[in-house]
């Protein structure tokens, strides 16, 4: 019993840090944080991108062939946007540690996404958005959500 309690208390902080959002829950959070029509991109675009980038999972990470890593619900890259302490010559343009992108609270991820989308290439910075969302009916990603 003592071992089980120890395990639970060790894993509890990990569970509290990340989250897999539902589609509508994420849409509501993104809207509250000002992403709806930010730089001309509807909320459906952002939810679509998050679906294909991370499956709405704030703890998603993916290692790239150049040695950088993508983090969080929008898979923000350590080469350009955040600092993971491992990626050589990281620009850290959002001025944040990559670890904050793995939290259940997506405030920092949204703040950084706004910086990225304002950088000149818009949502084209997200490969999944370019390949799966651009030019499609993204309104389906928020259909039925109470926003």
From Swiss-Prot:
Disulfide bonds join 24-145, 48-133, 82-98, 94-112. Residues 1-18 form the signal peptide. PROSITE patterns: GLYCOSYL_HYDROL_F22_1, GLYCOSYL_HYDROL_F22_2. GO terms for cellular component: extracellular region. It is an enzyme of class 3 (hydrolase). InterPro entries: Glyco_hydro_22 (IPR001916), Glyco_hydro_22_CS (IPR019799), Glyco_hydro_22_lys (IPR000974), Lysozyme-like_dom_sf (IPR023346). Its EC number is 3.2.1.17. The active site is at residues 53, 70. One of its GO terms (biological process) is killing of cells of another organism. It holds the Pfam family Lys. It comes from the Eukaryota. Changing residue 89 to G: In DL1 and lysozyme II. Lysozymes have primarily a bacteriolytic function; those in tissues and body fluids are associated with the monocyte-macrophage system and enhance the activity of immunoagents. This is Lysozyme C-1. It comes from Anas platyrhynchos.
